[in-house]
Amino acid sequence: MIGKLKGILEHVFDDHIIVDVQGVGYVVFISNRLRPSLPALGESLSLFIETHVREEAIRLFGFVAKAEQEWFCLLQNVPGVGAKVALAILGTLSPDELAQAIALNDIAMISRAPGVGKKVSERIVSELKSKALPFNDNALHFTPQPHLEVTHQPTNDALSALVKLGFERDQAARALALAMNALEGETVSSALLIRHSLKLLSPST
């Protein structure tokens, strides 16, 4: 099994690249998010590799971050999600954004990925709610998402309330995701979510 490749970027195609490692060219499939960060042809790069062995072929999938590779594997535990769908999701959402979407039951956010419909998105949230990898909670500020649609009603109400209190929508959503994780297993109301979120959003913390 190949776990990591370090070599020279030789060719770039629509869905894969060729990495030259000491004269051997490896075909590595990548997500759309990785393409803009690729080095120039002829320059070196290092990728975490997930190897899929099938009767007809051996396929290598490359990721810059270990978290992306872990999510790639985790997503494929969901019925109906194969390598192609998992890669499409990771090509649309970062690991942090995906973890946030699952924590917030945000079906619409996951459905933004090409070829991922509502039913698959609902299955991902349902199956991975208790297994999802944690996202980076060191900072509540993150890249804004223009179409954040929360489908869990108490969370939706809490989000609206926090926005009315003057917090940025994306900042409030991140705090709510942390609150949802902390309150897992409890009966969650919008008031309870608001209280927990305000503690996270308070300047004193």
Swiss-Prot record:
Q: Mention any Pfam family matching this sequence.
A: HHH_5
Enumerate the residue ranges of region (Domain I).
Answer: 1-64
Region named Flexible linker: 144-149
Q: For the region Domain III, give the residue spans.
A: 150-205
Region annotated Domain II sits at 65-143
Listed NCBIfam families:
ruvA
Q: Does the keyword Zinc-finger apply?
A: no
GO annotations under biological process? DNA recombination; DNA repair
CDD domains, per database record: UBA_RuvA_C (cd14332)
Q: Where in the cell is it found?
A: Cytoplasm
Q: What family, per the record? A: Belongs to the RuvA family.
User: How would you summarize the oligomeric state and partners of this protein?
Assistant: Homotetramer. Forms an RuvA(8)-RuvB(12)-Holliday junction (HJ) complex. HJ DNA is sandwiched between 2 RuvA tetramers; dsDNA enters through RuvA and exits via RuvB. An RuvB hexamer assembles on each DNA strand where it exits the tetramer. Each RuvB hexamer is contacted by two RuvA subunits (via domain III) on 2 adjacent RuvB subunits; this complex drives branch migration. In the full resolvosome a probable DNA-RuvA(4)-RuvB(12)-RuvC(2) complex forms which resolves the HJ.
Signal sequence segment: none
Q: What is known of its domains?
A: Has three domains with a flexible linker between the domains II and III and assumes an 'L' shape. Domain III is highly mobile and contacts RuvB.
User: What function is annotated for this protein?
Assistant: The RuvA-RuvB-RuvC complex processes Holliday junction (HJ) DNA during genetic recombination and DNA repair, while the RuvA-RuvB complex plays an important role in the rescue of blocked DNA replication forks via replication fork reversal (RFR). RuvA specifically binds to HJ cruciform DNA, conferring on it an open structure. The RuvB hexamer acts as an ATP-dependent pump, pulling dsDNA into and through the RuvAB complex. HJ branch migration allows RuvC to scan DNA until it finds its consensus sequence, where it cleaves and resolves the cruciform DNA.
The species this protein belongs to is: Bartonella quintana (strain Toulouse) (Rochalimaea quintana)
Alphabetic keyword roster: Cytoplasm, DNA damage, DNA recombination, DNA repair, DNA-binding
Q: What protein name does the entry list? A: Holliday junction branch migration complex subunit RuvA
Q: Which GO terms describe its cellular component?
A: cytoplasm; Holliday junction helicase complex; Holliday junction resolvase complex
Q: Which InterPro entries match?
A: DNA_helicase_Holl-junc_RuvA_I, Hlx-hairpin-Hlx_DNA-bd_motif, NA-bd_OB-fold, RuvA, RuvA_2-like, RuvA_C, RuvA_C_sf
- HAMAP family under this entry? DNA_HJ_migration_RuvA
* Keyword Cytoplasm included in the entry's annotation: yes
